[in-house]
């Protein structure tokens, strides 16, 4: 069709061209009662005091990027392996900011890093990398995240050359779900590519993670983004013109889908300049020999995602709900009945009025549990999440009960399902946004025998007890929630019945009793 596809394949496999150019979770002030306290995983990510070597030791180097390297590290006390992104401050290209004043330049550098930290803190989705800790010293920033041992999707593409439609659809559904979630929260990634998609392990495509939010930005519907950022193979033509919106991510996903199905990119070339010239024209082809066995539904989705005019291009949500993606969707089946029943049962029985206990159980569930411990519940969450936006709404929870009814499960035979779901949302929706978030689901649905080991309860207690006095104080709680102060009324509500010795503080034994009480009705 007039394209040298063989050269595209060879060039794509040997190059990773980089096109270079360069929550606030609390409320300060007059909180009247504990209902005003917003609880979410981002509140646990704070800049840690001390040297990173006191908490982690290096195992090996995983890779390197524009601003630093990524290390596999192991915690000295506790919960397995983590990936640590080490960002060397001096590696930033200070010239690209056209700033001569060193202080202003340093502020700009720090702004980019803090932007990535702020974004990662705010995200809670099964297909988006999770941030645990942040360290900083004179030379480096350290971002501690989940470790996914399966490596990059890029490596899988090189090894497998291309994927069948079922595997490609499974990969794209997860990527699009993550992108849909980002866009719903007014975040555009701007650097979606196979190198920024990680696999849980090399033998499974069921759990992937979107990483590297260094180029991400918040957007509004009224304002167009203007920075020229991204990677040449995957960059959208409107980004080259410096006038674009969140749909630049959809274009990048379209390029990835094209590559997954045929093994080479739609816009190839010997160098960045060649590639960008082709992207600017937006012309690509489905070579007959390479695409003759690919379904029309798959090709149609690619066409919609690679629509040149971004105003006419489909959204991530529309792509996620396309016929081709839905054709290969993994739905809840009979083998999932036990996990689904246990999850809904645990949510039904959860008593979430104690804010301190809510915060503790969310910390344990989101930060201390392992991938293996979360695996079955993560799978159920994604299957319940029919629209793929990374959150469970009332309709999706009701559908969970309806599925159990179809399996003749007694939990599905409840007469007042809508009332039950309303109560679940009231108790489990910790941040009161009207949805059950991924970490809320995991934390409340998981077996309390897994959650409430003495080690994990101690770690949760230490999160609050920042001065290591053995007591949780009013001031420490205010600090965790990002408040300037806590009223006596709110503190008394938080203390509740936990403060057995009436010393106006909570010790470890009182904390443990409180945690078991809030979940006494959970199935174990």
From Swiss-Prot:
Keywords for this protein: ATP-binding, Calcium, Cell membrane, Cell projection, Cilium, Cytoplasm, Flagellum, Host cell membrane, Host membrane, Kinase, Lipoprotein, Magnesium, Membrane, Metal-binding, Myristate, Nucleotide-binding, Palmitate, Phosphoprotein, Repeat, Serine/threonine-protein kinase, Transferase
Positions contributing to ATP binding: 62-70, 85
Positions annotated as active site in the UniProt record: 191 (proton acceptor)
Motif J domain autoinhibitory motif positions after renumbering to this chain: 346-353
Broad EC category: transferase
Residue numbers covered by motif J domain interacts with the EF-hand domains: 354-364
Effect listed in the UniProt record for changing residue 152 to A: Severe loss of catalytic activity
UniProt modified residues of type Phosphoserine: 17, 28, 34, 64, 118, 217, 220, 335
Motif (Basic cluster involved in membrane binding): 10-20
Stated regulation of activity: Activated by calcium. Upon calcium binding to the EF-hand domains, the C-terminus of the junction domain (J domain) undergoes a conformational change which results in the dissociation of the pseudo-substrate inhibitory motif from the catalytic domain. This, in turn may facilitate the autophosphorylation of the activation loop at Thr-231, which leads to the kinase activation. May be negatively regulated by PKA-mediated phosphorylation. Inhibited by purfalcamine.
Protein name: Calcium-dependent protein kinase 1
Protein's organism: Plasmodium falciparum (isolate 3D7)
């Amino acid at each position: 069709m007039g394209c040298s596809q063989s050269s595209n394949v060879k060039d794509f496999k040997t190059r990773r061209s980089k096109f270079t150019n360069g929550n606030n979770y609390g409320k300060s002030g007059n909180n009247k009662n504990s209902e005003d306290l917003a609880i979410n995983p981002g509140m646990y990510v704070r800049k840690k005091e001390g040297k990173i070597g006191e908490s982690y030791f290096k195992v090996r180097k995983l890779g390197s990027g524009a601003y630093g390297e990524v290390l596999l590290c192991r915690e000295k006390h506790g919960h397995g392996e983590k990936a640590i992104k080490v960002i060397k401050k001096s590696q930033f290209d200070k010239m690209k900011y056209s700033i001569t004043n060193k202080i202003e330049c340093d502020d700009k550098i720090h702004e980019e890093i803090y932007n990535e930290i702020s974004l990662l803190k705010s995200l809670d989705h099964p297909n988006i990398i999770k941030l645990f800790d942040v360290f900083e010293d004179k030379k480096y920033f350290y971002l501690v995240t989940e470790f996914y041992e399966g490596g990059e999707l890029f490596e899988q593409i090189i090894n497998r050359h291309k994927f069948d439609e079922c595997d490609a659809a499974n990969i794209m559904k997860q990527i699009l779900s993550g992108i849909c979630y980002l866009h719903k929260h007014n975040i555009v990634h701007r650097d979606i590519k196979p190198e920024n998609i990680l696999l849980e392990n090399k033998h499974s495509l069921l759990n992937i993670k979107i990483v590297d939010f260094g180029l991400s930005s918040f957007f509004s519907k009224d304002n167009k983004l203007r920075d020229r950022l991204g990677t040449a193979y995957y960059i959208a033509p409107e980004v080259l013109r410096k006038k674009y919106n969140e749909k630049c991510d959809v274009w990048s996903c379209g390029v990835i889908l094209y590559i997954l199905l045929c093994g080479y990119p739609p816009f190839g070339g010997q160098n960045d300049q060649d590639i960008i010239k082709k992207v600017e024209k937006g012309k690509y082809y489905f070579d007959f020999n390479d695409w003759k066995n690919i379904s029309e539904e798959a090709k149609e989705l690619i066409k919609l995602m690679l629509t040149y005019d971004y105003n006419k291009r489909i959204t991530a949500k529309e792509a996620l709900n396309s016929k081709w993606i839905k054709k290969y969707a993994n739905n809840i089946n009979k083998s999932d009945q036990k996990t689904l029943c246990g999850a809904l049962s645990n949510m039904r029985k959860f008593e979430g009025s104690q804010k301190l206990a809510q915060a503790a159980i969310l910390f344990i569930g989101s930060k201390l549990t392992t991938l293996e411990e979360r695996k079955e519940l993560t799978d159920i969450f994604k299957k319940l999440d029919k629209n793929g936006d990374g959150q469970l709404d009332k309709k999706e929870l009701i559908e969970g009960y309806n599925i159990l009814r179809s399996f003749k499960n007694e939990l599905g035979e409840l007469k007042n399902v809508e009332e039950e779901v309303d109560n679940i949302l009231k108790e489990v929706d910790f941040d009161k946004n009207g949805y059950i978030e991924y970490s809320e689901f995991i934390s409340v649905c998981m077996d309390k025998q897994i959650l409430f080991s003495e080690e994990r309860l101690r770690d949760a207690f230490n999160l609050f007890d920042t001065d290591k006095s053995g007591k949780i104080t009013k001031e420490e709680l205010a600090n965790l929630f990002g408040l300037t102060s806590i009223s006596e009324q709110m503190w008394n509500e938080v203390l509740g019945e936990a403060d057995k010795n009436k010393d106006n503080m909570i010790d470890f034994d009182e904390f443990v009793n409180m945690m078991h009480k809030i979940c006494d009705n959970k199935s174990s």
